């Protein structure tokens, strides 16, 4: 029994060392974040300062090591436009009801350092599809809510990656 425990522990230790050695990192982990954001002083200005996307971006900036400041102290200014959410039917059932829906979440962003536009005004967007089950209204509503939350996080991650890339160039 002790030998089996030792083998199991050795196997787990070997696999974790192998994954670490090959450079594997979880997506979005703090250790895997872009080092160019660490210590950057950023002012976040949003057309919708209290919405979920602004909160998600602020949270991810902090996790990446950025410091959110007032305009006087910030060296970078990140501007977010209004969030736009659209639904589009991809396919219909025989009863002319929506069978598959495409969801698009987007916003306009820009990043400036003094008078230099690091990211000129551009659109960031994420697109998802989901199957619309007309028989399961409660489940569909919950799935849509979870999908929107996931889209907020994905869009915020995309914006953070763009910021990191612009700071490295």
Label for each model-derived stretch:
Residues 2-7, 20-58, 64, 167-169:
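A structural "domain/chain start" motif
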Residues 7-14:
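Sec-dependent N-terminal signal peptides
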Residues 35-37, 71-73, 96-102:
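Short coil/turn motifs at beta-sheet boundaries
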Residues 50, 54, 100-104, 144-156:
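Solvent-exposed, acidic/flexible segments
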Residues 61-65, 111-115, 134, 158-167:
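Sec/Tat-exported extracytoplasmic proteins
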Residues 66-76:
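Short acidic low-complexity segments
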Residues 79-123, 129-145:
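Surface-exposed short loop/turn segments
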Residues 138-169:
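C-terminal/domain-edge helix-coil "capping" segments
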